[in-house]
């Protein structure tokens, strides 16, 4: 068996593991084949550097392309051409959103989005995330990425019962990435624990991240670390010109941190 074949088998096994863990039994996801996620906008135009998405199926396709096929979109820009609603039910079941980019620490799965996502001032609404996903938001895992000019609507809701979750409206985990001029209106919460991070915009920042010009209006709550913009920073992270208007609820306990803007500010952050 060639090295390439071995790698493909390993990747396939990782992805089966990844998708079997986060979602509750029999839940319906936007990335399911039954919901017809559209990946053709990319797979038929891989040579391009800029793509404009206008449909929820195309946005779901982005999740499939990153999480399953591990296209990072590094050096490429994705734009929203209009507001997009992810509100959908099948029978009595809500169709859940699968965040773009995976991070499952215990299984050593780290699959980030590395491109630029420009909302162009448009709103993504109706996003619903629940279950035991570890990195939660429209994006789960960002590394070397930029997300800008994006609005998350008030009819969305994200949470997780994972004991090590990182939960935010825009993204769960941020590494060496920039979040610029983004606004959140939805509630962000977790039943929590001391290892859970919940932020209005970003769950947890992890090394050399930058959040600038962002606003949060949604209620943010978590018994662990919680912040109106982000729950926690790390080495060389920066949060500037951000405003929180939402209610922030934490818990007075050891290793739990609560802040209107940042829950826990690392010594090398600002």
Label for each model-derived stretch:
Residues 3, 19, 25:
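Nuclease and nuclease-like effector domains acting on nucleic acids or nucleotide cofactors
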Residues 11-22:
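Bacterial N-terminal signal peptides
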Residues 1-11:
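Bacterial N-terminal signal peptides that target proteins for export
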Residues 26-270:
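Surface-exposed repetitive/solenoidal architectures
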């Amino acid at each position: 068996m060639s090295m390439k074949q071995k790698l493909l088998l390993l990747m396939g096994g990782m992805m089966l593991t990844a998708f079997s863990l986060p979602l509750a039994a029999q839940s319906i996801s936007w990335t399911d084949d039954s919901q017809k996620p559209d990946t053709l906008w990319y797979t038929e135009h891989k040579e391009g550097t800029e793509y404009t998405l206008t449909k929820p199926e195309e946005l779901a396709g982005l999740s499939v392309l990153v999480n399953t096929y591990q296209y990072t979109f590094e050096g490429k820009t994705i734009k929203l051409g209009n507001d997009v609603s992810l509100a959908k039910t099948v029978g009595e079941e809500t169709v859940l959103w699968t965040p773009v980019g995976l991070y499952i620490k215990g299984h050593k799965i780290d699959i980030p989005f590395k491109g630029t996502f420009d909302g162009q001032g448009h709103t993504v609404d109706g996003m619903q995330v629940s279950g035991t996903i570890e990195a939660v938001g429209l994006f789960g895992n960002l590394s070397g990425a930029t997300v800008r000019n994006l609005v998350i609507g008030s009819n969305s809701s994200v949470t997780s019962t994972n004991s090590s979750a990182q939960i935010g409206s825009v993204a769960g985990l941020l590494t060496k990435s920039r979040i610029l001029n983004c606004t959140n209106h939805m509630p962000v919460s977790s039943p929590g624990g001391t290892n859970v991070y919940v932020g209005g915009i970003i769950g947890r920042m992890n090394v050399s991240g930058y959040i600038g010009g962002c606003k949060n209006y949604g209620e943010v709550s978590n018994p662990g670390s919680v912040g109106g913009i982000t729950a926690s920073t790390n080495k060389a992270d920066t949060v500037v010109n951000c405003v929180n208007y939402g209610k922030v609820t934490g818990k007075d306990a050891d290793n739990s941190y609560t802040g209107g803007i940042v829950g826990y500010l690392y010594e090398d952050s600002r």
